[in-house]
Curated annotation (Swiss-Prot):
Keywords: FAD, Flavoprotein, NADP, Oxidoreductase. Belongs to the ferredoxin--NADP reductase type 2 family. Homodimer. It catalyses: 2 reduced [2Fe-2S]-[ferredoxin] + NADP(+) + H(+) = 2 oxidized [2Fe-2S]-[ferredoxin] + NADPH. FAD binds at residues 44, 52, 57, 97, 132, 296, 337. Binds 1 FAD per subunit. HAMAP family: FENR2. This is Ferredoxin--NADP reductase. It comes from Paraburkholderia phymatum (strain DSM 17167 / CIP 108236 / LMG 21445 / STM815). InterPro entries: FAD/NAD-bd_sf (IPR036188), FAD/NAD-binding_dom (IPR023753), Fd--NADP_Rdtase_type_2 (IPR022890), Ferredoxin-NADP_redctase_2 (IPR050097).
Length: 351
């Protein structure tokens, strides 16, 4: 699988199916597309593959994937990426698809916020609950510091080596990053509005052990203001039950979780009800022929929000998409057990 986080080109990538979303359903769709003879390109707004599984609960167990009694969300994503390898679908991360237009020849042209263009015969939207954006710190003095001293993600631990850090949040991401940062930062303080957490028990236990060992601090309270004379963060004001305190820090990492937003999808002319794209359950096609939806973003009566359901939806959608990519060609069904070409691809991808 080829990956790119930043591409801008005047020549559009050409493919049979554009898959919007690199969560479990989007990744499986790329594999299934290859199995039935379709090329695909995957685009996702987030900087890493995995969708909600990786962004919200990477280390929580999943029990309802056929033939896998138990695995973490991270393990599932890793296995799906491995499954895709025989077809090497281009994977463009950190790209939000902003516009989708139908060309005179019936094909689709999609453009991302970073200048990537993809032309395809069909589009499969597997974007979960839409684009994920971080919940920002709701303080007027935070915005000018974002990207320099106030952060909503970590790209490289080394960027914070020797720095004083405050990490805000109570979920897995906040605790895990606080624990990771303590290995490189001069000092780390985790702050959360209460003494209870939404993180896994193991993450909470690891954090409390680190605090007891003096490897990091934990404080209960809410961030009231930022002290940044000359535009450089020096401390935060933490409001607590007994009053306010100043915590010295060089950087503030805010991990309040992610919020879902359909964003530009609402402007693509597909019927949307209750935040879901309405689909025909015979083929999971939207109200615009050639645009399909699978996974949590697909809406229909008795919808079950399961990864398993998304796999089924994507499989049927791609079979209809085949007719747009190859209208004059009859698709011949071959069971994977008897597909010699598939066997060769799988073998080659592991050499």
């Amino acid at each position: 699988m080829t990956s790119s986080a930043n591409i801008a080109t005047d020549s559009p990538a050409n493919t049979d199916v554009l898959i919007i979303g690199a969560g479990p359903v989007g990744l499986f769709a790329a594999f299934e597309a290859g199995v039935i003879g379709l090329s695909s390109v995957i685009v996702d707004n987030v900087e890493r593959a995995g969708g909600q599984c990786i962004e919200l609960y990477p280390d929580k167990p999943i029990y309802d994937i056929p033939a896998i009694p138990s695995c973490t969300a991270r393990e599932l994503v890793d296995r799906l990426l491995e499954q895709c390898r025989p077809f090497a679908p281009p994977l463009h991360l950190g790209h939000r698809v902003d516009t989708v237009e139908q060309l005179d020849n019936g094909r689709w042209l999609a453009r991302t916020d970073k200048g990537l263009t993809v032309e395809s015969a069909a589009i499969l939207i597997a974007a979960g609950n839409g684009s994920f954006v971080p919940q920002r710190l709701q303080l007027d003095d935070a915005a000018p510091l974002e990207g320099h001293y106030v952060h909503y993600s970590v790209s490289n631990l080394a960027d914070f080596a020797g720095k004083k850090m405050v990490v805000a949040g109570g979920g897995d991401s906040a605790l895990d990053w606080a624990l990771a940062l303590r290995t490189v930062a001069q000092h780390v303080t985790l702050v959360h509005r209460r003494n209870g957490f939404s993180a896994t028990d193991s993450s909470v236990a690891n954090m409390r052990r680190a605090v007891e060992a003096g490897e990091m601090n934990f404080a209960v309270g809410t961030i009231a203001s930022l002290n940044a004379p000359g535009g450089q963060l020096e401390s935060i004001e933490l409001r607590q039950a007994e009053g306010s305190v100043q915590l010295a820090t060089d950087h503030l990492l805010v991990l309040f979780g992610l919020v879902a937003d359909l964003g530009p999808i609402q402007q693509w002319g597909v019927e949307v009800r209750g935040g879901r794209i309405t689909v025909d359950t015979s083929n999971y096609e939207s109200s615009r022929p050639g645009i399909f939806a699978a996974g949590d973003i697909a809406g229909y009566p008795n919808k079950q929000k399961l990864i398993l359901s998304g796999f089924h939806e994507a499989s049927l959608a791609l079979r209809k998409a085949y007719s747009y990519a190859y209208p004059d060609k009859k698709r011949v069904h071959i069971h994977s057990s008897y597909d010699a070409k598939l066997a060769e691809r799988v073998a080659a991808s592991h050499t």
